[in-house]
């Protein structure tokens, strides 16, 4: 089979087929003195294709007797057909070399290569018929040859062109060029569902084993001296075993029937149990199951009521519970009761082969009548499972792991898999027929894929999937999968199971139409009796990835492929991705009705689930996979999310047992065991709430009504009530953080970015509407200096200690926090009164309730809101942690402070002002946020945890270790803020604070990691910014419009602030910009191609040998990962191709404008050289586009004028002609 990766490389490329004709004219070969060739043959070859010339005798020359020449008096023509491929953007075809080999043919006919030379066929390819004279110099392969040369003419004729994946572009020879395929009679394999590529047993081996088995039977039956008939039967079998393997199988089938006849006559008691042993599941498989079962039973009872018969014990458990099949074999082999000599291993093996053949004949009968009814040929008893699947179980168990003790706990392994590989338990009562799909606590990629395929196709007639080879040959299985997900693309009922080529063609065309790379062709299945396993697996993996949302998309391309970033799913962080709000709100309302689990440990579990959803490449640069959970997906979040986590475990085989267990356990939606269902619900519910909670903040009154909470005027609560409530939330938060931190460290030691998710302080920074933040920034900064600085420094250092130290100090810090909160409340009141008096000349005793604030104060708040929005934009761009966190009002501040202290986070050096005074403008603009905080505090077991988890997801990859560059910058800014705030006057504080804000807007430290990952923030915040606002909120929204627009622009560019070629799914550009991205993609492809070639070679070797299952599994995981990356690159290149062909100038103009605005939003000093070049390219492109558009407008204008002139001319002409016609009519008179 041709290399799978080669086919994957050809996806999206153009192909042209050429016919080349070589006309040999003269061959010169110079030899050593001691040797001369007999006859020479020129072979033109590539891989397994060979085109040989006739043998010609070598004639020594006159001048140099060691140099001889072969001359063709009539040129000999050798023709080949070559398919050349090229990238849509490339000018020339890809390289394809054919080799000329000069061979010496001895008198005995033996050939030996003497010299070789290769030519690149693309150099001679031409769309027009051409003929080229070629003189090739050869490289000697033998010491006997000194030099060689060949003169010939090479003609090229262009045949046709098309897509590289078109069937007529595939060379039939190349389909089988990688290895010799096992080609047999297609009709035989049509009904054969037994063949598994890795478990093939050739006929000679089968014959030898059957002979051995027959001898064992002979010995077994000879033990009973009274049963002469059985001895004769065995002798008869023994004599027949010398014949060919095919004959043996037919004879043994006949003998099997003869044994059943003997059993009915009761002539041989051994035959009854033996027949049953040969076919332990004979009831459902035979044509008359009930009678056949009853007859041996009666005979057995009449002859053997004692336990003399060793097979009697086996039958009952096998019929009652097919899952006990391995234990039954254990009983036979390892723990025989009385007659040890009679209980031999061989009768079991006998059943293995004989039963295989009997099932095969039964399938043949069914196929000849109606193959669609193959799985339901006869109604089995209720307590029996599908006999064909059990057959496959029996075969695989015996071939793969013949030692029965290993197989006996199979049921237990399957139960364990409910957690570690939940996909393996389908909703049907049958377990996976293959031994445990978990190898070394890692999910078995191939087995989980097989189970997925079975699950998807389980109700389709004519489909029975047991392997990755013959089960797929007639195309019905592929068609069933396509019909399951896209019934509009294929009419399954109209398919003919005998039409292999047409079935496969319909399936492959359907998958290609929805963007799945085409790796198989109908001719593969027609020509190859046993399709290539790796190709089928890879194709199926692509199909599963597509329909389950596991497809990767390019985020950022680096020079080194291992550092490039991909994300799972097709979620767009682009603000123009236009998520349907109706869908989003509908989903939100559904989520709010879901019950929430309140165990504190579930918080830690959910932390782990969030960590698992971060896709980490080899370099550890992460991207949140939760981005792909949009309502636009055809899968619901509950479906997409587990698949997201599944991919993580696929790509990182070194995952811990707990992590891999959960990820694979939720791999297939709705298929969970009892032990895992609760956990899965927690994970799904929490994960979905992460997305929905952001919208919940905007439902000002809706959230109040749903949760029966108090109105959004927080000042009505007393300080003591608040602090008590905060204490409850704080305790829960501490416990949760401790659990999550310890579990998280164990979860994935490879990822350096995951420990950054534990700062609730920084999380809250982006949780609520940005419009609130700046309003109380002054209070926050002032309270920083007046709070206890020693405790703050201790807290900062505390972040570097282990979680154990945090736990020891939690109780003492609780009391400290309470006291500090009370002090801050008093200070907040005094500060608010002072500020109101100084700035607005209002009453010095400003009331503490929202309703009494002046209009001037509202204006000041709005101005501060705009300032805060700009600051947040700068923070998001720079990766600096939020040293000056927003004041959300008393509840938010206190809650934030409690959480921060409880978690031992470094941001504890920031104190939040808890001024009870909340201006009316704030309730108008952000009352929903405050209300939501209040709701959180009233139900701390639920909402505080969920809000915190949501915020963790938003900022989970932001570096937060105390010694990181970004945190160092934050510390510096915070300390400078503290110094500034110690001055006495309010005006000076305001001035200094503005300077601090400017520092945020022009940050000193630029964190590369954060630039890659910060886009997740906007994927949630855009819904807040674009949500339907309440009427009272619009005034503030208008004021902050400019800030929001700037944020949207920054969002678009955050993926590519410091890289040469960064791929932004939200942007499309033309011309030079496209060329630059394509260059980066091609570089990435080359690196992936190099690695994939090695992986495929090694994987094929491991699959053929089957020696190292763990390495094979690791290679399989890496292979699937590479395939997924390759498909992501293919999709990106297709997008760029479409964009390049975009001839709509208006659309191009909009796209260019959009990209340019995003570029210009970055400060000049922050731009790299690459970004400056790209910006210049965009400007040039835009200017050229404007010029083109102007030229078009002028042309159109000229054309319109010309058209008007022509219309006028036509009108004049018509009027003149009309007058002439009228005159003629007047002259016409009837006579």
From Swiss-Prot:
Q: SUPFAM superfamilies this protein is in? A: Calponin-homology domain, CH-domain
Where does the record place the region Disordered?
264-318, 358-440, 616-675, 737-764, 777-800, 837-865, 895-941, 960-996, 1025-1065, 1198-1231
Compositional bias segments (type: Acidic residues):
905-919
Q: Where is this motif: CAAX motif?
A: 1228-1231
Q: How is it modified after translation?
A: Prenylated. Farnelysation (predominant) and geranylgeranylation has been observed in vitro.
Residue ranges of domain bMERB in the record: 1056-1212
Q: Where is the composition biased (Polar residues)?
A: 302-318, 654-675, 754-764, 839-849, 960-976
Q: What is its main location?
A: cytoplasm
Q: Residues bearing Phosphothreonine?
A: 694
Keyword RNA-binding attributed: no
The residues forming a coiled coil are: 185-210, 808-879, 1076-1100, 1136-1230
Keyword Lipoprotein applies = yes
Pfam families recorded: bMERB_dom, CH, NT-C2
Q: Protein name, please?
A: EH domain-binding protein 1
Q: Which organism is it from?
A: Homo sapiens (Human)
